[in-house]
Amino acid sequence: MYAHTLLLFYERRYQMNNILKYSSKLFFLGLAASTIALATNVPATAEETPQAGQELVNRADGQWIKDATGWWFKYPDGTYPKNQWKQINSRYYYFNNQGYITTGWKQLTGFNKHKEVSWYYFDPTNGDMKTGWQAINGKWYYFDPTEGYMLTGVKQIGAPGVRKYYYLHPTNGDMQTGWHKLPHSYANGETIYYWRYFDPEDGHRVEGWRKIDGDWYHFTRGMGVMSSSAWNGQYYLKEDGKMAHDETLLIRGKYYTFNSDGIVTSVK
């Protein structure tokens, strides 16, 4: 009887030890799983700034919030972008180091293929990056239609087939009109400055014939260079580019007389 009771005692003790070991394993496994879950759910306090040239992912989740300082964007996990470009609902924004959207003019490093530091313009109210032609404080500027950086210099702008050349100030970027003497570089390394004329109304570079301040001028096709000291058909463009009329000129050893329409009436 005693032996039987002792056997039952040890058998139960063995079972209890196994249960405790199993329970301990479950406890530690549960603790580890909880730790992993906790680590993966910890909200980030800051986001990485995209490197220049990195393509942005379009975000639609989150909430716009406006406070006394300005607008900022809050993600579902409570984090918010700062010191970086963001594409939200297909529009581009730049968030400053406090997380607020940038408005007006800002010099920044590009966010996609354009890696240079350039000027950008953000809507004064909404903060979205502007593209294409923009009238700002009475002046016209042109921003890349895809990446938004301000263009400078002589640029061909417009849809295929109707593109025209414009002169955007090399520093300020505002569209220029009227007369400008601009450089043209050739394949042999030579650079020559030519007079060109940009329409006072829409700023496009003029080609062909144009009457300016009462005088006729001719500008070459393709380059828009003012013709000078040269014949164009039956008309003669003087050194200053004006078409000869109502006068007699000595040209290559001969005297040419021009009527009021610029037609040669006599040669001596």
Where are these regions (language model features)?
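Extracellular adhesion/carbohydrate-binding repeat motifs centered on closely spaced tryptophans
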Residues: 3, 8-268
